[in-house]
């Protein structure tokens, strides 16, 4: 569903009615992590209980509405419009961290494979 042109209240209502999901934000060029932070954790829920890692650059947390067991979000603390804007050092940090987390998830959940989506 295209969310462009909708105000926050309309988007929040659609979320509460389970009529949209994270992919709808991404498809509409709306950062779901920023929307979540700006709207009282409406998408991912209270991250304090599920925060796996946080530092000055990145955060990693389990989401409250996972697509599968072990579904995590790794995001930069600073918002970037797209990956082209991310400084190389931060991009490297995110991907090295993602690889570490993918190995942990694979072992914890005995997965055959783990996927990284941007």
Describe the residue ranges of each PLM region.
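Active-site microenvironments that recognize anionic phosphate/pyrophosphate groups
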Residues: 1-80
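Short histidine-centered catalytic/ligand-binding loop motif
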Residues: 72-95
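A short glycine-rich, hydrophobically flanked beta-strand micro-motif that places a catalytic Asp/Glu
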Residues: 109-118
